[in-house]
């Protein structure tokens, strides 16, 4: 067994020597290739390791570059937006400037007054002193054009726009409307008469002779009726808000004027049945400050309420034309008479509508004096006849009554006072003690702040406190005591009479006394913090009021002053004041040496 094994072994090693070399060469070659590959791979690995170590730094560089590029992009975007906005603004400015240039380059537009239109679309207009027939722009509806309306004309004198009616011009007086209805005869400021066309607003509304019209003299159109302030100011469109309950101490006078004014209007059938004519006028006379004007206003208020209750309408109305005497006087001859005519013309117009109208003349003696009694002029010679004719004209009207007020009825022309004109004469006298209490009660009210001490005296009853205050202050005012002596008058026959403050009291004086007392209460509250009106305030106010009226009008005719103040009878030739000072040491004085004027006397 060992023989063949060694034989085969030696035979094999000696039999193939070339194969071993080739194998070795192949092996070495393979080793060399592998070594080369390993070396390449090692270099590749080294290079990869080197690249791997360098990658984070490159990433950071790239990120920084990217951030820088983004910032530059944002900056460029903002600059681009600004540039776009600038370009747009420049374009808008260019467009605006172009429009402005085009607007300024347009030819001027003229104005004209529309006269009439035609079926073919043309119209007549008056412009620049010429009457032209022109066409109307398609943008303008020719049907809406009204006579007298202002229109705008382009360069070719075509109507391109409709405007409102003219609002400025001259004021003329309407004399009459002509038969055609669209023309009127007017009187200018120089008494020049001319015929004008009536614009559409005047064609739609009623106009009367005597109205003031606004005209444009070049076109000859009247556009608007202008209210006449001289008459409109005298008309109180709203009913006066004064009622009979607000007037104190004049119950008898109120009843008399209600019988004269309200009964004929509210019970017309009964008056007709008894063939009784209603009075045309009422004269309220008496001293100043006693309520004559208040009564006249209360009549209008009461009459309006009675009309509302009788007719069932929602809002009763009574027109109250309040004419103060001196307002009518004018330096031009005939102006006063004209204004009187206008006042009664307005009264007739309102009365024709079924509304009661009261024409109230305050201070009637200032213009309707006895004819022939003027010193520097005799204007009353024409004013009085004008009023007489107007009052007689009221005879045919059912709803107009004249009320006059005066504190010198003896100076009014007797023709005005006779029956058939101012039929009813009501004397508004100075208040006596009972009337004074009634007047005080209108102003000293329980809801006023009253002093705690005064309330305590009357058990906290506010009504009783007010009554107690009124009772004491009236007793103080009407006491015929030494401190209340006011005047000593000497009559023509030599008799003398002492007059007290109560003889010159009035409703206005009582109102002023209460106002003084309230002001004292306010000052006490401000200075000392004590709230409430008290008795002492009223008594002090009464003394202050008496003291103020110490000075009388400086007149050389005491009898005239006595008539104004309400003391009438035998002629007075001398008046001496008896008012003493606070200490009772001041002597009486003659009025002839006194220059100041009292408040109510």
Curated annotation (Swiss-Prot):
Comp. bias (Basic and acidic residues): 18-29
Residues given in the record as ATP binding sites: 289-294
Keywords tagged on the record: ATP-binding, Chaperone, Coiled coil, Nucleotide-binding, Proteasome
Pathway: Protein degradation; proteasomal Pup-dependent pathway
InterPro entries for the chain: AAA+_ATPase (IPR003593), AAA_ATPase_domain (IPR050168), ATPase_AAA_core (IPR003959), ATPase_AAA_CS (IPR003960), NA-bd_OB-fold (IPR012340), P-loop_NTPase (IPR027417), Prot_ATP_ID_OB_2nd (IPR032501), Prot_ATP_ID_OB_N (IPR041626)
GO molecular function: ATP binding; ATP hydrolysis activity
Superkingdom of the organism of origin: Bacteria
Gene Ontology biological process terms in this record: modification-dependent protein catabolic process; proteasomal protein catabolic process
Signal peptide stretch: none
Coiled coil: 19-106
Biased composition (Gly residues): 1-15
Annotated region (Docks into pockets in the proteasome alpha-ring), positions in chain: 600-601
Comment on protein domains: Consists of three main regions, an N-terminal coiled-coil domain that binds to protein Pup and functions as a docking station, an interdomain involved in ARC hexamerization, and a C-terminal ATPase domain of the AAA type.
Family: Belongs to the AAA ATPase family.
PANTHER family: AAA-FAMILY ATPASE (PTHR23077), PROTEASOME-ASSOCIATED ATPASE (PTHR23077:SF144)
Stored NCBIfam families: pup_AAA (TIGR03689)
Subunit structure: Homohexamer. Assembles into a hexameric ring structure that caps the 20S proteasome core. Strongly interacts with the prokaryotic ubiquitin-like protein Pup through a hydrophobic interface; the interacting region of ARC lies in its N-terminal coiled-coil domain. There is one Pup binding site per ARC hexamer ring. Upon ATP-binding, the C-terminus of ARC interacts with the alpha-rings of the proteasome core, possibly by binding to the intersubunit pockets.
Function: ATPase which is responsible for recognizing, binding, unfolding and translocation of pupylated proteins into the bacterial 20S proteasome core particle. May be essential for opening the gate of the 20S proteasome via an interaction with its C-terminus, thereby allowing substrate entry and access to the site of proteolysis. Thus, the C-termini of the proteasomal ATPase may function like a 'key in a lock' to induce gate opening and therefore regulate proteolysis.
Protein name, UniProt field: Proteasome-associated ATPase
Lineage per the UniProt record: Bacteria, Bacillati, Actinomycetota, Actinomycetes, Frankiales
């Amino acid at each position: 067994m060992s023989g063949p094994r060694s034989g085969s072994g030696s035979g094999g090693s000696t039999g193939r020597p070339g194969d071993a070399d080739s194998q070795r060469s192949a092996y070495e070659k393979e080793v060399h290739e592998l070594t080369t590959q390993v070396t390449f791979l090692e270099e590749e690995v080294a290079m990869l390791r080197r690249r791997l170590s360098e990658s984070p730094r490159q990433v950071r560089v790239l990120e920084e570059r990217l951030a820088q590029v983004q910032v530059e992009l944002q900056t460029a975007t903002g600059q681009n937006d600004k540039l776009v906005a600038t370009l747009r603004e420049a374009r808008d400015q260019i467009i605006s400037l172009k429009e402005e240039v085009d607007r300024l380059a347009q030819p001027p537009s003229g104005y004209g007054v529309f006269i009439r239109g035609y079926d073919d679309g043309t119209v007549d207009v008056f412009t620049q002193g010429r009457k032209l027939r022109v066409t109307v722009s398609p943008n303008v509806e020719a049907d809406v054009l009204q006579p007298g309306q202002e229109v705008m004309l382009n360069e070719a004198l075509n109507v391109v726009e409709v405007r409102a009616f003219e609002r400025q011009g001259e004021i003329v007086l309407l004399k009459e409307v002509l038969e055609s209805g669209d023309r009127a005869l007017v009187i200018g400021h120089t008494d020049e008469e001319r015929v004008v066309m009536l614009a559409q607003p005047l064609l739609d509304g009623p106009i009367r002779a005597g109205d003031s019209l606004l005209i444009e003299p070049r076109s000859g159109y009247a556009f608007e009726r202008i209210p006449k302030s001289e008459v409109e100011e005298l008309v109180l469109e709203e009913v006066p808000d004064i009622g009979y309950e607000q007037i104190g101490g004049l119950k008898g006078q109120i009843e008399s004027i209600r019988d004269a004014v309200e009964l004929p209007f509210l019970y017309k059938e009964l008056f007709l049945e008894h063939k009784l004519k209603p009075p045309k006028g009422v004269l309220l006379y008496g001293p100043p400050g006693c309520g004559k004007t208040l009564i006249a206003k209360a009549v209008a208020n009461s009459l309006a309420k009675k009309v509302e209750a009788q007719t069932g309408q929602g809002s009763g109305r009574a027109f109250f034309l309040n004419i103060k005497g001196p307002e009518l006087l004018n330096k031009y001859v005939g102006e006063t008479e004209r204004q009187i005519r206008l006042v009664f013309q307005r009264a007739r117009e309102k009365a024709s509508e079924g509304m009661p109208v009261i024409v109230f003349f305050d201070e009637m003696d200032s213009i309707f004096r006895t004819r022939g009694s003027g010193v520097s002029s005799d204007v009353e010679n024409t004013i009085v006849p004008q009023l007489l004719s107007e009052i007689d004209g009221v005879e045919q009207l059912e709803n107009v009554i004249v009320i006059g007020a005066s504190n010198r009825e003896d100076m009014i022309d007797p023709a005005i006072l006779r029956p058939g004109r101012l039929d009813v004469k009501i004397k508004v006298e100075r208040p006596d003690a009972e009337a004074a209490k009634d007047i005080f009660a209108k102003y000293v009210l329980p809801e006023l702040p009253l002093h705690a001490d005064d309330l305590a005296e009357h058990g906290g009853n506010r009504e009783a406190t007010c009554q107690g205050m009124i009772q004491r202050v009236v007793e103080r005012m009407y006491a015929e005591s030494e401190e209340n002596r006011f005047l000593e008058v000497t009559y023509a026959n030599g008799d003398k009479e002492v007059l007290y403050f109560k003889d010159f009291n009035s409703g206005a004086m009582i109102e002023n006394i209460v106002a003084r007392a309230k002001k004292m209460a306010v000052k006490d509250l401000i200075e000392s913090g004590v709230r409430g009106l008290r008795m002492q305030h009223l008594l002090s106010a009464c003394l202050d009021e008496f003291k103020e009226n110490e000075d009388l009008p400086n007149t050389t005719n005491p009898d005239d002053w006595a008539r104004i103040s309400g003391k009438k009878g035998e002629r007075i030739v001398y008046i001496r004041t008896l008012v003493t000072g606070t200490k009772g040491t001041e002597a009486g004085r003659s009025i002839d040496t006194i220059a100041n004027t009292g408040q109510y006397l």
